[in-house]
């Protein structure tokens, strides 16, 4: 059991002094010279919260000779000798930069010449690997669990999680001081709000980091449990169903009957557990008995309640059978229906009819949410009829076409793997005629006249994907080729990150 407790330390061997690079300002400037944010991208920060300001603040702090004092009041807290609000904002911003550097070193071995991926993290996969996984593996699984990651979490729990990785007493006193200033220390985060909305947008970097730290902690424990459960078929374990650490290795040999031993091993063998997290939720897909799946459900609940002190009820996890349940995932509507196929087999004078159950993954484009998104962005009305985009009417023809083509190409790349293309073609139709109406509005012409002009100049060919061009070039292809081109094509660009999943 001691070796498992050591494993649950989660490789917390980087005992860094977090305040050292912050106070020795030249070091933090050198560390962040070529550093890009690892946890957040494209955040509009105020120019007042730059690395240069952090350096100047550190210099000013060295020049101060008086102590830092608090004056407790029922309405406000005043900071004697300092502009506390300004200083705390600056130091929190500097702290966010420092911890991103230190924790990104756990994923990347950083140097001033470049970055090299650590061997233990070379199996990081892109979002594009999810769809082939669904097509190849999901049909062999039978249960799916929707897990809503519980929050709010107490700030003290976050600080304690951080202490496992970074041991610096002075830092934790300082960070508690900042947290106490921004909130009542004995209160939780407000419900139904994201973790960084409790604080100002200026501190989004630091609290995104703390939220990711919380998720990383619980997922690391879950990964440990999942890996050990998959190895139970190779070693003898004693099972404890009522505890989070639900098994320990038997140090002394125990005489058990072969029947009981084989039953225990069969109970955990061939688990087929797959876990995906996105947008504050996660999906756990399994192939197991309902009894073991319910046990995993209670393991999650006990983990959150006992390890993180978060109340998680039974409603945070829903378990459904994949064959009887459809679900939304990453902008798709997924279902696995059971298709019955009848095969006639004849042997000499006797013939047999054999029914074969075949599972097939259906990936359907969610037309209603997409229509709402297009109507919200003024590409169509609430009925789905294309309308012009008057905001873009002042742009050049090239810019208008480029914007519409980029949006249409993104839709084509992302939804080309849908099983039923009717909804997919409706979206392309809306975008195409919205572009034509916008150009006709700009040139004060009718849609019919401008459509002929665009067709003659072949400016709309970019609206066709490779699959559509195949159908135009080979209109009389064989039945086999038609079935091939009508099939599912995952046209995904690993160099491009699609943003549609954030709005669906």
From Swiss-Prot:
GO terms for cellular component: chloroplast. It comes from the Eukaryota. It is found in: Plastid, Chloroplast. GO terms for molecular function: RNA binding. One of its GO terms (biological process) is RNA splicing. InterPro entries: Domain_X, Maturase_MatK, Maturase_MatK_N. Disulfide bonds: none annotated. Keywords: Chloroplast, mRNA processing, Plastid, RNA-binding, tRNA processing. PANTHER family: MATURASE K. Belongs to the intron maturase 2 family. MatK subfamily. Usually encoded in the trnK tRNA gene intron. Probably assists in splicing its own and other chloroplast group II introns. This is Maturase K. The lineage of its organism: Eukaryota, Viridiplantae, Streptophyta, Embryophyta, Tracheophyta. The gene is matK.
């Amino acid at each position: 059991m001691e070796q498992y407790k050591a494993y649950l330390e989660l490789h917390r061997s980087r005992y860094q002094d977090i305040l050292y690079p912050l106070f020795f300002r030249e070091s933090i400037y050198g560390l962040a010279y070529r550093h890009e944010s690892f946890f957040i991208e494209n955040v509009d920060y105020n120019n007042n919260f730059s690395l240069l300001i952090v350096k100047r603040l550190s210099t000013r702090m060295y020049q101060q000779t008086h102590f830092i004092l608090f004056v407790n009041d029922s309405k406000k807290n005043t900071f004697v000798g300092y502009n506390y609000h300004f200083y705390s904002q600056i130091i929190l911003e500097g702290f966010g930069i420092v911890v991103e550097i230190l924790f990104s070193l756990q994923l990347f071995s950083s140097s001033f010449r470049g970055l090299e991926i650590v061997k233990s993290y070379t199996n990081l996969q892109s979002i594009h690997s999810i769809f082939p996984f669904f097509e190849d593996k999901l049909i062999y699984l039978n249960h799916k669990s929707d897990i809503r990651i519980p929050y709010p979490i107490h700030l003290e729990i976050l600080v304690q999680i951080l202490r496992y990785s970074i041991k610096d007493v002075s830092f934790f006193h300082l960070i508690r001081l900042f947290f106490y200033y921004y909130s009542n220390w004995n209160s939780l985060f407000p419900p139904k709000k994201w973790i960084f909305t409790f604080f100002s947008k200026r501190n989004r970097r630091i609290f995104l980091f703390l939220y990711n730290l919380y998720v990383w902690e619980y997922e690391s424990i879950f990964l440990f449990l999942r890996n050990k459960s998959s190895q139970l078929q190779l070693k003898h374990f004693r099972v404890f169903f009522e505890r989070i650490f639900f098994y320990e290795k038997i140090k002394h040999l125990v005489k058990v009957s072969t029947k009981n031993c084989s039953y225990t091993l069969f109970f955990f063998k061939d688990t087929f557990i797959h876990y995906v997290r996105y947008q504050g939720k996660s999906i756990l897909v399994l192939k197991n008995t309902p009894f073991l799946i319910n046990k995993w459900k209670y393991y999650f609940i006990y983990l959150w309640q006992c390890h993180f002190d978060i109340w998680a009820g039974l409603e945070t996890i829903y378990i459904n059978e994949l064959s009887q349940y459809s679900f939304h995932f990453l902008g798709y509507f997924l279902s696995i229906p059971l298709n019955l196929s009848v095969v006639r087999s004849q042997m000499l004078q006797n013939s047999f009819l054999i029914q074969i159950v075949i599972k097939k993954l259906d990936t359907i484009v969610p037309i209603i949410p997409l229509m709402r998104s297009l109507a919200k962005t003024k590409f169509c009305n609430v009925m789905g009829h294309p309308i012009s985009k008057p905001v873009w009417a002042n742009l050049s023809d090239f810019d208008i076409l480029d914007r519409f083509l980029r949006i249409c190409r993104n839709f084509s790349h992302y939804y080309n793997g849908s099983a039923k293309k009717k909804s997919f073609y409706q979206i392309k139709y809306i975008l195409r005629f919205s572009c034509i109406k916008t150009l006709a509005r700009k040139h004060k012409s009718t849609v019919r006249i401008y459509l002929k002009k665009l067709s003659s100049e072949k400016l709309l060919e970019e609206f066709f994907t490779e699959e559509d061009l195949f159908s135009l070039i080979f209109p009389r292809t064989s039945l086999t080729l038609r079935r091939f081109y009508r099939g599912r094509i995952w046209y995904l660009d690993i160099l491009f990150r699609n943003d549609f999943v954030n709005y669906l």
